Amino acid sequence: MSSNAIDYVGIGFCSNDYLSVLPHIPYDSKVQMLEHLIQGGGPAATATVAAARLGLSAAFISTVGDDDPGKRILRDFEAEHVSTQAMIVRKGFVSPIAYCWIEQATGKRCVAWTRGNLAELDPAKEVDFDLISKAKMLHLDGHQTAAALAAADVARAHGVLVNFDAGTIRPGVEQLVRKADILITSEEFARRFTETDDLSQAIFKLAETGARVCGITMGEQGSMVLDNGNILRCPAFTIKPVDTTGAGDVYHTAFGVRYLETHDLMECMRFASAVSALKCLKLGGRTGIPTRAQVDEFLRNH
């Protein structure tokens, strides 16, 4: 494949999301929606959109079907100036979709999703490694595992930083963890992967993987990273969230984007926390993702 140089390349899960804001999340009952939205989703997919919003050139690599959800996934990427040149469209297959229910009072949500019936990328013939080799950063979410592992090897061989959003324990995840330059995990992942409930111990165990940067996101409690053997903690910004969908996805991107500019890890966390907070002010994983100018203004005022 011919490829132009792209700053930020994502590989992983992409879906079509159906989001609804509800007064409460019902069980065995009905409730009227207060607001609803359809837009593209997926951890690495939303993360890659965030890179484009923050001013980097971006591309995504994954599979979709040629059905209506698949076509919408591609349109949403293109509307966000994320290149789809390396996307694989499988004819006659069903694309991933997700249903998200968001509780109005808290912004917390429940998600039900399906990967459709798509075969994963074949790294031998369906991954644009030239695109990856010319990037500044490769973003992985643990999906498309075989392709992600091969892509990480190519990235590291060409000095491209690997940013791994470790949110879920999946087959092959331990191999991916050991290929990451930036390894920031969710609380749940950190506890399960390290087999300890003490996050202050877990972060040191994560560092044993060899990543340059290890961190843990903790939602409203902020985030932490390890810096030369010292734990740095950054509080989350106080906001009234509308929807927390995608908050972690954009945090990982924002941390990586800032890390390309400075290795001041506290500054990277603060920048990422600002992007995540601003995202949560609007419905949808992508609607509220800020531009760089909006982030800079927010930080000047906080």
Regions from the PLM with identified roles:
Residues 79-92:
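A glycine-rich helix N-cap at a beta->alpha junction
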Residues 49, 97-101, 110, 222-225:
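Short beta-strand scaffold segments in enzyme catalytic cores
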Residues 152-233:
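Conserved phosphate/ATP/ADP-binding segment of small-molecule kinases
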Residues 1-63, 68-72, 78-79, 240:
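Glycine-rich phosphate/adenosyl-contacting loop at the front of the ribokinase-like
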Residues 89-90, 100-137, 142:
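Conserved phosphate-binding/catalytic loop of the ribokinase/pfkB sugar-kinase fold
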Residues 1-9, 32, 199-302:
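Conserved phosphate-binding/catalytic region of the ribokinase-like
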